[in-house]
């Protein structure tokens, strides 16, 4: 071994130029590998950020949940955050100019704003209780004026039905075009009053979708949906974000929360939960944020993983 070292050193001294070129080449190669790896990771993070803005920052959504289950879920050691959202309903008014104005009212837990869904605040602040709300900048009052921070708004908020009188669920609302929305009716209204605390841009998040011409109102939920939420198809959801340490085990985590076997969980919406399982789990359905999970390296989407790997190879 000593002889080999001596021969190597002697060879390096005799070929100084080649030695310097070799050392520089090694340094450049190491630097290039570091730069390429950094660019690949940066590109992956950009994709994750974009998907988070579109779908929301969560791992699984529990659809039509019995709110009595929420506190227990939040106490689960694998859950970092749980964000609650419920659709309070819709309202329709005619302003002083004779213009028909439609409104959508959503209530969310206070920690949802900025943590689960990206909502850009133009002025003011986010609401802190169920008597406060933020509204989109297109919001007009009944006298035809744009609303300001500090104004009080009162609306008759009710359930949306299609032209045939059928109550629309979340899927029906997502499939609703603006021209069809104009034919819908609003029934079983309740008068609701809010103090406007802020003005926001219209969110781009798919989970906050409403037909484009509606003004949107976001308030804070008291998380007291009907006890029979599952049977009455009350439109509410709980979005769960697992801790970084347990996120890779999202299937088992979700199975534990719902009281299912991990083998029964799939990476798609489950719309065939039996009545017995509904009572056990306290939900009507569940859906994983599968694209986001795949981008983080946890999901099973081959297409998403292939795109990320291809980008790294191209770079």
Feature map (PLM): residue ranges:
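N-terminal Sec/SRP start-transfer signal
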Residues: 1-31
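Juxtamembrane interface helices immediately C-terminal to a transmembrane segment
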Residues: 8, 12, 31, 35, ...
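Hydrophobic alpha-helical bundles that form the membrane domains of multi-pass transporters
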Residues: 283-315
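Charged, alpha-helix-enriched surfaces in structured cytosolic catalytic cores
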Residues: 3-7, 38, 191
């Amino acid at each position: 071994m000593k002889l080999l070292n001596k021969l190597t050193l002697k060879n390096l001294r005799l070929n100084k130029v080649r030695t310097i070129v070799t050392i520089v080449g090694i340094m450049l190669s190491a630097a290039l590998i570091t730069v390429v790896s950094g660019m690949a990771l940066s590109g992956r993070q950009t994709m994750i950020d974009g998907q988070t803005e579109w779908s929301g920052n969560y791992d699984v959504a529990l659809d039509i949940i019995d709110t009595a289950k929420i506190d227990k879920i939040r106490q689960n050691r694998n859950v970092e955050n749980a964000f609650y959202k419920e659709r309070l309903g819709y309202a329709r008014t005619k302003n002083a100019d004779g213009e028909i104005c439609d409104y959508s009212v959503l209530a969310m837990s206070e920690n949802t704003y900025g943590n689960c869904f990206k909502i850009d605040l133009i002025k003011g602040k986010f609401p802190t209780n169920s008597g406060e709300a933020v509204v989109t900048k297109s919001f007009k009052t009944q006298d035809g004026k744009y609303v300001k921070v500090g104004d009080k708004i009162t609306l008759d908020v009710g359930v949306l039905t299609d032209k045939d009188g059928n109550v629309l669920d979340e899927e029906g609302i997502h499939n609703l075009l603006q021209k069809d929305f104009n034919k819908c009716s609003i029934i079983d209204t309740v008068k609701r009053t809010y103090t406007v605390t802020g003005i926001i841009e219209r969110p781009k998040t798919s989970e906050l979708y409403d037909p484009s011409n509606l003004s949107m109102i976001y308030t804070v939920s008291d998380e007291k949906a009907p006890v029979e939420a599952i049977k009455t198809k009350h439109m509410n959801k709980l979005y769960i974000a697992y801790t970084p340490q347990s996120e890779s085990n999202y299937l088992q985590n979700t199975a534990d929360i719902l009281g299912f076997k991990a083998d029964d969980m799939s990476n798609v919406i489950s719309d065939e939960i039996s009545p017995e399982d509904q009572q056990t789990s306290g939900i009507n359905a569940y859906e994983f944020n599968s694209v986001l999970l795949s981008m983080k390296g946890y999901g099973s989407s081959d297409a998403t993983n292939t795109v990320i790997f291809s980008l790294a190879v191209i770079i």
